[in-house]
From Swiss-Prot:
<dbReference type="Pfam" id="PF07690">
    <property type="entry name" value="MFS_1"/>
</dbReference>
<dbReference type="GO" id="GO:0005886">
    <property type="term" value="C:plasma membrane"/>
</dbReference>
<feature type="transmembrane region" description="Helical">
    <location>
        <begin position="380"/>
        <end position="397"/>
    </location>
</feature>
<keyword id="KW-1133">Transmembrane helix</keyword>
<keyword id="KW-0812">Transmembrane</keyword>
<protein>
    <recommendedName>
        <fullName>Uncharacterized MFS-type transporter MJ1317</fullName>
    </recommendedName>
</protein>
<keyword id="KW-0472">Membrane</keyword>
<dbReference type="GO" id="GO:0022857">
    <property type="term" value="F:transmembrane transporter activity"/>
</dbReference>
<feature type="transmembrane region" description="Helical">
    <location>
        <begin position="316"/>
        <end position="338"/>
    </location>
</feature>
<keyword id="KW-1003">Cell membrane</keyword>
<feature type="transmembrane region" description="Helical">
    <location>
        <begin position="43"/>
        <end position="65"/>
    </location>
</feature>
<dbReference type="InterPro" id="IPR036259">
    <property type="entry name" value="MFS_trans_sf"/>
</dbReference>
<comment type="similarity">
    <text>Belongs to the major facilitator superfamily.</text>
</comment>
<feature type="transmembrane region" description="Helical">
    <location>
        <begin position="259"/>
        <end position="281"/>
    </location>
</feature>
<feature type="transmembrane region" description="Helical">
    <location>
        <begin position="89"/>
        <end position="108"/>
    </location>
</feature>
<dbReference type="InterPro" id="IPR020846">
    <property type="entry name" value="MFS_dom"/>
</dbReference>
<feature type="transmembrane region" description="Helical">
    <location>
        <begin position="224"/>
        <end position="246"/>
    </location>
</feature>
């Protein structure tokens, strides 16, 4: 009798584990749709801004504000999610908010409107990210690197399709930037379908956790890692500067190609990002997050140095490919490392704090990059290279 009950409990636990692991794929497909939508917009956003009168500082402002707004919300939403032990409602609200502001961005006709609505669109990311990542970490606790790698691979596969669609719409249908953004907004609303099937891990609300206690209870190693991540973020300014660098170089060669080729290079970046996200996540499960992150930060520094001094038509292909590899090394593994270093009851708070600190530094990062660009583009990328390599070396001391 006891054995039979034990077997039934084991079977029930296995079924629950399978249900939870499905969450990773459902959230991955949600990310696929969202990034298809977002990445139809992202490669053309810097061109949209410059076409309506914005300059490098405008690009720096929108690049910084987008990350600042999204990340500043994450610690508060993460804390609220831990407090009430609810994840899914915040995830749904986040994706819905993003889609609504994409729609308004598509109706915008000025650089100021592009800055405002593009920045507010990232509120959605700030609302959904920490609770979503907490669901992933609770669904695959023994293989976090693989879990976040799967989510990141879906995310980036959607990005490849989205930026490819953007390129095809321009090449063959001659759609305007605004038309492409409106189509992207419609796709964004489709993210709500797979979210319906996500199941939360049941757990009681934790009224004992206050915001201050949640932050105070974070381990010293985690706080140190978040500090180093902030230093790295100062080097990791907006992707738009990489597209702008390629566009300005190609303008000398062919004005028409200066629009098409940067989008194609951005697709190449996403292909390498998607291809290596899961392998590098699995690698971090085996050899440790810190080792993989150190390599990622240093590779990013080398890429930034390449954009400063080794620009040619052929080198742009190599540099955008390495840019994708660098992101595959550090993007998902940063979140996995934060999850490793935090307990389950404060995990969303820890992830939220990580994103918020990163967000606070992303605004000055892109503004500094925009200011340095006015001196020379080389200065922007040299600054990024030095800080990234320093960050990689600092990880060795955790």
């Amino acid at each position: 009798m006891v054995r039979k009950v034990a077997e039934q409990n084991l079977q029930k636990n296995n079924e629950n584990d399978r249900e939870l692991s499905k969450n990773v794929y459902l959230l991955g497909f949600t990310s696929f749709l969202n990034d298809m939508s977002s990445e139809m917009i992202m490669p053309i956003l810097p061109m949209l801004i410059t076409s309506v009168g914005g300059g490098s500082l405008s690009i720096g402002l929108v690049g910084g504000l987008r990350e600042f707004i999204s990340n500043i919300l994450m610690v508060l939403i993460g804390y609220c999610s831990d407090k009430v032990r609810k994840r899914k409602i915040f995830v749904v609200l986040g994706y819905l908010t993003s889609s609504m502001f994409k729609l308004l961005l598509g109706l915008s006709k000025s650089w100021l409107g592009a800055v405002i609505f593009s920045s507010l669109e990232r509120m959605g990311k700030g609302i959904r990210t920490a609770p979503r990542d907490a669901i992933i970490s609770e669904s695959m606790p023994k293989t976090l690197g693989k879990g976040f790698g799967i989510q990141r691979a879906f995310d980036t596969a959607g990005a490849i399709l989205g930026s490819t669609l953007s390129l095809l719409f321009i090449l063959y249908l001659q759609y305007s930037f605004n038309q492409i953004i409106l189509i992207a907004a419609v796709i964004g609303f489709l993210t709500l379908i797979p979210l319906y099937f996500v199941k939360e891990k049941p757990s009681p609300s934790n009224n004992k956790i206050t915001f201050r206690v949640g932050i105070k209870n974070l381990p010293k190693e985690l706080k140190l890692f978040i500090l180093i991540s902030a230093i790295f973020t100062l080097s990791n300014f907006s992707y738009m500067f990489y597209i702008l660098r390629a566009q300005e170089f190609l303008m000398i060669v062919d004005e028409k190609m200066a629009i098409i080729i940067p989008i194609a290079l951005y697709i190449l970046y996403n292909i390498f990002y998607a291809t290596f996200s899961i392998p590098f996540g699995i690698l971090s499960d085996k050899i440790g997050r810190k080792s993989v992150l150190t390599i990622g930060y240093i590779v990013y520094g080398i890429v930034s140095l390449g954009f400063a001094y080794f620009i040619s038509q052929k080198s742009l292909i190599l540099l955008f490919a390495l840019y994708g590899i660098a992101y595959a090394l550090f993007a998902g593994n940063q979140k996995a490392y934060v999850s490793d270093l935090s307990s389950e009851d404060i995990r969303a708070t820890a992830l939220g704090l990580f994103y918020t600190v990163v967000g606070l530094t992303s605004l000055p990062a892109s503004l500094i990059a925009g200011y340095l660009w006015k001196i020379s583009p080389e200065m922007t990328f040299l600054y990024g290279s030095v800080l990234a390599i320093i960050s990689g070396l600092l990880l060795l001391f955790i």
